Amino acid sequence: MKGINNKQRKQLQLKAITMFFAVLLLSACGAKKQLVKDNNKVVAVNNTTTAPQVAKKENSEALLKLAFIQKVADTKVFNDNITGSMSFSLNTGNKTINLPGSIKMRKNKVIRLQLFIPLLGTEVGRLEFTPEYVLVVDRLHREYIKGDYSQIDFLKTNGLNFYSLQSLFWNQLLLPGQNNVTESDLKKYDVKLAADNASQNIITFSKDKFKYEWKADKTDGRISDVAVQYNSADHGTSLLTWKYNNFKSVGVKSFPAEQEFQLSTNAMQKQKQATIKISMDEVKTDSDWEERTTLSDRYKKIEAQDVLGKIMSAGF
């Protein structure tokens, strides 16, 4: 070039090289590459592949969660009847009662606990749940409490009805306000997948005033623990925990012969807590029994609201 000395020529070449590298950098940005510092090393990350990989990982985790919930749901027994003799224990903090008894449950029909005098075998009390009502019978004093679920304080203030109680007694998942859990309902739950060295995953569900948590075995899906928290602006906070042990074979499935549930609540003016433990001698599927209790005119009906107080005072 005329009129350009060597120094100017070198400057022009340097500018051209600089522009060339600038174009390369812009091209790199156009390809959506960015530099990430990782442990003081510079690593190239390609965004065009990262997003699909993340989506694939999230989708894979969601499928794992759904498959586990399905496994838990599939553990329920097929039989319509669960029966057996039992040992019944009630602890209210300042009083403990241990009595023999029996349990009879018919799916979607009734849950019945009967308590007997030791050795004699005479029935002293009965607690019966049906879809329509709750019945508590005191055989010794010939008194009974009967009311629907809105009339029974400790059930109403804890958001419990027959179907939620049935799910708890039968060692199954539940959804508040629903009679059962369908296949399409399974996606409503979330799962906290445990680490490889842990034995249980945690299933959770929250809605309005309810918080539910189930602990279930990673391998067979069997539920071992349930926690139900109910928060009410009018009635305070209640916590129900339910534990299952000593599973017995019922057909191709299994059923917990030992159940322990604890209710703590401040919903009735003062803090109350009760722990009930049921230990079945064996788990049967007998169907030859009446599903509804009938009482003679000799029994006197008393106030329905304080049924928990009646149970906890163990008047029978």
Please provide the spans of the model-predicted regions.
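Bacterial N-terminal signal peptides that target proteins for export
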Residues: 3-18
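C-terminal motif of bacterial Sec signal peptides marking the signal peptidase cleavage site
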Residues: 25-28
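N-terminal leader/targeting segments and the immediate start of mature chains
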Residues: 30-95, 304-316
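Gly/Pro-enriched, hydrophobic low-complexity segments
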Residues: 31-35, 181-300
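Edge/loop elements at the starts and ends of beta-strands within beta-rich repeat scaffolds
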Residues: 73-82, 92-97, 104-106, 127, ...
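Transmembrane beta-strands of outer-membrane beta-barrel pores
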Residues: 88-92, 117, 263
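An acidic-aromatic
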Residues: 110-163, 167, 301-305
